[in-house]
């Protein structure tokens, strides 16, 4: 799916009055490595939305095609009471895949979540996601450049612990002994929180940056600003395992 700056491809709700969570989202499954116990990188995972679909493998440069100049708007619908889509979900996607110039508006869960994989993503804008702006787990090891996340003035999240970045080394922090914990790099990142500056769970970020459960992140040239509230700017502690940034 390749648009242009003048004519981006738009995935959105079929409604004149769309709201977040109106439809599912975009999910890409690849064959790149994820965290696991096998030294030969043969571990696979099952998608959150439908466990009939696998992802992961040992192909670092796996190619899932290209996604450029794309808008994803009002995604994040729930498939069950406990499972909801992200705007963009990248499961074990390899670095042979091209993902650039992506705009995600008002996803009902995370704007984008990486489940392992090695894919590199450039130029990503996330506006008013209900949960995390950028979420990483299960051994993600790619490079990210030019990331911009914003909560606009007057926006209200309904999640208990929304974050700018949330990073786990392994899936749900339950596998601290796994090989290939998340270890990724972010260059040029801006997080703007202009939501209400209060202390309750629906009007502030839990953490701007949360690196935990064995994850490691190298963040270069980052700017955090805004009038909104947060409990922690950077937090690397967790009851299951700490992180490293």
Spell out what each predicted region is.
Residues 2-3, 8-109, 113-130, 135-245:
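Extracellular beta-rich repeat passengers
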């Amino acid at each position: 799916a390749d648009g242009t700056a003048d004519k981006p491809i738009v995935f959105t709700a079929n409604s004149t009055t769309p709201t977040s969570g109106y439809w599912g989202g975009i999910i890409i499954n690849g064959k790149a490595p994820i965290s696991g116990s096998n030294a030969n990188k043969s571990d696979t995972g099952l998608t959150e939305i439908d466990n009939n679909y696998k992802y992961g493998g040992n192909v670092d440069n796996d190619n899932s095609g290209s996604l450029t100049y794309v808008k994803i708007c009002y995604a994040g619908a729930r498939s069950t009471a406990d499972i909801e889509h992200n705007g963009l979900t990248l499961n074990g996607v390899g670095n042979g895949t091209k993902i650039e110039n992506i705009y995600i508006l008002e996803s009902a869960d995370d704007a984008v979540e990486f489940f392992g994989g090695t894919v590199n993503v450039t130029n990503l804008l996330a506006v008013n996601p209900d949960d995390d702006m950028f979420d990483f787990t299960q051994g993600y090891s790619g490079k990210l450049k030019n990331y911009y996340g914003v909560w606009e003035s007057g926006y209200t999240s309904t999640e208990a612990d929304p974050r700018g970045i949330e990073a786990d080394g392994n899936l749900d922090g339950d596998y601290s002994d796994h090989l290939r914990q998340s270890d990724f790099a972010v260059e040029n990142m801006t997080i703007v929180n202009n939501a209400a500056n209060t202390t309750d769970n629906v009007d502030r970020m839990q953490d701007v940056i949360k690196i935990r459960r064995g994850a490691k992140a190298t963040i270069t040239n980052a700017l955090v600003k805004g009038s909104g509230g947060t409990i922690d700017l950077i937090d690397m502690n967790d009851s299951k395992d700490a992180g490293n940034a």
